[in-house]
Amino acid sequence: MIRHLITTKDFTKDEIEDLFDDAQKFLNEPTPHLLKNKLIITIFFENSTRTRSSFEVAAKRLGAEVVSLDVSKSSTKKGETLFDTAANLNAMEPHAIVVRHKSAGVPYILSKYVSCSLINGGDGAHAHPTQALLDLFTLKQHFKAVEGKKIAIVGDIKNSRVANSNIELLQRFGMKVILVAPPHFLPKTDLPISYDLHAIINEVDAIMSLRTQTERHKYPIYASLRDYGNDFCITKDLIKDKDLIILHPGPVHRNIDISDEVLTDPRCKVLEQVKNGVAVRMAVLKKLIMHG
């Protein structure tokens, strides 16, 4: 049966633990070319540095062929519908397609038009499942057991697909989540919230800082990003010598999301997230293509 990864809910807890076992092996051992002669197509309708390159490196390390569709030169710019694009890509008989789109729901809809696994590389402010998976993997790598650990998600939560996916996944694995942001960056939620980062810093084991999604704002909310950073930047003065770790999905707005000093602090796991992202995406590709 063909399976897709549209949201984190598409995999059970047991399946995710198995994924993480594979990801750890990929980090520790030479990678066998498990996907030799397999074809993976990436099509990103929104800009991406980390996610796209991470999927492509993951596929190539597994021995797969990768075709990246340049949307700026594709037929969608000439009036071809998304569904025609999906049908044409599907006719090339790929084994998986990775899609990113600015509109929520597009990967789910496209999955109905293809006969291979479709992976959501991010859709609007809806979901980014592989980012949440690599974030959880990074947290488990550090804490071993994450159940009962408390994480603050800080920043533009309302517009963040990363936050949406992490809120679902981290809670499913027993983590406590608190949302920290100015009121206009918070979604309607039953989760605990705070408008003051300093007020909750002593009660959390981890902080996930998010980028301000200015491209998704209908009008300027802050006079400048610097004003936002004055209240919500993760600084050395904030974290002092506390026993916690810091995550960020990237790209980081330096000295607005996280200070230069904290980015070089060993408690900041941003580069580990990038490294882990390749291994986790390798595990996802292996699972969907080889096992369904």
UniProtKB/Swiss-Prot annotation:
The keyword Transferase applies. The keyword Transferase applies. GO terms for molecular function: amino acid binding; aspartate carbamoyltransferase activity. It is an enzyme of class 2 (transferase). One of its GO terms (biological process) is 'de novo' UMP biosynthetic process. SUPFAM superfamilies: Aspartate/ornithine carbamoyltransferase (SSF53671). Keywords: Pyrimidine biosynthesis, Transferase. Its EC number is 2.1.3.2. Carbamoyl phosphate binds at residues 50-51, 100, 128, 131, 250-251. GO terms for cellular component: cytosol. It catalyses: carbamoyl phosphate + L-aspartate = N-carbamoyl-L-aspartate + phosphate + H(+). InterPro entries: Asp/Orn_carbamoyltranf_P-bd (IPR006132), Asp/Orn_carbamoylTrfase (IPR006130), Asp/Orn_carbamoylTrfase_sf (IPR036901), Asp_carbamoyltransf (IPR002082), Asp_carbamoyltransf_Asp/Orn-bd (IPR006131). Catalyzes the condensation of carbamoyl phosphate and aspartate to form carbamoyl aspartate and inorganic phosphate, the committed step in the de novo pyrimidine nucleotide biosynthesis pathway. Heterododecamer (2C3:3R2) of six catalytic PyrB chains organized as two trimers (C3), and six regulatory PyrI chains organized as three dimers (R2). Belongs to the aspartate/ornithine carbamoyltransferase superfamily. ATCase family. This is Aspartate carbamoyltransferase catalytic subunit. It comes from Nitratiruptor sp. (strain SB155-2). The lineage of its organism: Bacteria, Pseudomonadati, Campylobacterota, Epsilonproteobacteria, Nautiliales. The gene is pyrB.
